[in-house]
């Protein structure tokens, strides 16, 4: 029976400490309320604290009062609200590109980009640690998919050399890897893209708002934006809202409007979200001090965890893993920290490779050094109790 098979699958996940459950949580700045407790939150993507910014809250409420609650249709029917044009014009100015398109989520953006650009006549070259949305988009595109070793440009070049010349070549990468906090070798990827006539698609989900003079992303931080063919980013992390964007040449955006199925066949975003996006794009460009504060906190946190003896991988950003290995230890580590007032969720396979279960700490600019000092002391104490560090 089907139900018995489903039950057996869930039981197998539980036996491997991979079963997922939902926990009710209510965020409050850099804190979170779970089971009646007030806990310091290291598991949010609200990197700049914008999700609770009064300016964004006001923009959301005003858009709802003026335009109503729902979008009523897809964008290609009658759901293309004037706020879309306002937000996309702001995106074009912010990113310095010819055109931009707002879509409903980062997942649908990546699935749509790859399934539109690639087909049976294409080869997608994808970093092995890319986000699941990139993996799924590549698979659904029906293109040939070559996954190169993480950040290994020599392996990527070997694969590019072997690819059939007549096929369209697409290199795709996260700019900041969401489970490891390290940065893609963008300069080297640009060289390979130009050498082998490939397109380069980048996912700036965890860099948008954080890097670049005005928060445009890692490509702008490294002054490589003009060499990127397709920029993707989200509004749901540092910008505190919801949805995602695709930016690039006008012809690319026009092509997506006509071929991107997750865009064509989904209801448009509600006015409240669009109003929030417009305001978020405006204010994130002005919040240079918040970005600097987040970078300083992140450097401090990483340094002290390393000095304590933890394995934080190759992180250089505001995303800091503590890699512990097996699933049970990661779950136990997370549970003990929660008892002490810290939320850091255990990340397990298949989200990360087997044997690399970890706690993923993501910092927020609204945190203070004093809060980090307290957290580092608690994390270190638990790490010693569990034998993770000496």
UniProtKB/Swiss-Prot annotation:
Disulfide partners: none
Keyword Iron listed: no
Reaction(s) catalysed by this chain's protein: 6-carboxyhexanoyl-[ACP] + L-alanine + H(+) = (8S)-8-amino-7-oxononanoate + holo-[ACP] + CO2
Pfam families: Aminotran_1_2
Cofactor(s) essential for the protein: pyridoxal 5'-phosphate
Highest rank taxon of the organism: Bacteria
SUPFAM superfamilies: PLP-dependent transferases (SSF53383)
Molecular function GO terms recorded: 8-amino-7-oxononanoate synthase activity; pyridoxal phosphate binding
Gene3D superfamilies from the UniProt entry: Aspartate Aminotransferase, domain 1, Type I PLP-dependent aspartate aminotransferase-like (Major domain)
Keywords, alphabetical: Biotin biosynthesis, Pyridoxal phosphate, Transferase
Enzyme superclass (EC): transferase
Binding locations of pyridoxal 5'-phosphate: 106-107, 178, 203-206, 234-237
EC number: 2.3.1.47
Residues at which substrate binds: 20, 131, 351
Cited InterPro entries: Aminotrans_II_pyridoxalP_BS (IPR001917), Aminotransferase_I/II_large (IPR004839), AON_synthase_class-II (IPR050087), AONS_Archaea/Proteobacteria (IPR004723), PyrdxlP-dep_Trfase (IPR015424), PyrdxlP-dep_Trfase_major (IPR015421), PyrdxlP-dep_Trfase_small (IPR015422)
Assembly and oligomerization: Homodimer.
Protein name according to UniProt: Putative 8-amino-7-oxononanoate synthase
Species for this entry: Anoxybacillus flavithermus (strain DSM 21510 / WK1)
């Amino acid at each position: 029976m089907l139900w018995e098979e489903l039950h057996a699958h869930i039981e197998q996940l539980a036996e491997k400490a991979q079963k997922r459950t939902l926990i009710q949580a209510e965020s409050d700045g850099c804190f979170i309320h779970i089971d009646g407790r007030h806990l310091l939150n290291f598991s949010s993507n609200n990197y700049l604290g914008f999700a609770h910014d009064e300016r964004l809250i006001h923009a959301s409420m005003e858009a709802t009062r003026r335009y109503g609650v729902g979008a009523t249709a897809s964008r290609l029917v009658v759901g293309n609200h004037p706020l879309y044009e306002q937000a996309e014009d702001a995106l074009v100015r912010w990113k310095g590109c010819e055109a931009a398109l707002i879509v409903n989520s980062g997942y649908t953006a990546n699935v749509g980009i790859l399934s539109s650009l690639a087909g049976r006549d294409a080869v997608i070259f994808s970093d092995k640690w890319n986000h699941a949305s990139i993996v799924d988009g590549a698979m659904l595109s029906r293109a040939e998919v070559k996954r190169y070793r993480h950040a290994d440009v020599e392996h990527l070049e070997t694969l590019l050399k072997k690819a059939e010349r007549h096929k369209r070549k697409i290199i795709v990468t996260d700019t900041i890897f969401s489970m490891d906090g390290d940065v893609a070798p963008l300069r080297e990827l640009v060289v390979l893209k130009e050498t082998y006539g490939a397109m380069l698609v980048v996912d700036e989900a965890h860099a948008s708002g954080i890097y670049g003079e005005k928060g445009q992303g890692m490509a702008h931080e490294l002054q490589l934006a003009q060499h990127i063919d397709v920029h993707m980013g989200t509004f749901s992390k540092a910008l505190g809202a919801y949805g995602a964007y695709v930016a690039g040449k006008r012809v690319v955006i026009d092509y997506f409007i006509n071929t991107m199925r997750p865009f064509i066949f989904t209801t448009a975003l509600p006015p409240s979200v669009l109003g929030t996006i417009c305001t978020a794009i405006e204010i994130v460009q002005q919040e240079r001090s918040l970005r600097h504060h987040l970078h300083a906190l992140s450097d401090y946190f990483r340094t002290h965890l390393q000095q304590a003896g933890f394995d934080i991988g190759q992180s250089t950003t505001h995303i800091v893993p503590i890699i512990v290995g097996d699933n049970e230890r990661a779950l136990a580590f997370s549970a003990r920290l929660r008892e002490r007032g810290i939320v850091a969720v255990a990340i397990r396979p298949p989200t990360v490779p087997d044997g690399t279960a970890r706690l993923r700490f993501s910092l927020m600019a609204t945190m203070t050094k004093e809060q980090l000092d307290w957290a580092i002391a608690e994390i270190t104490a638990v790490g010693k109790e569990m034998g993770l560090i000496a």
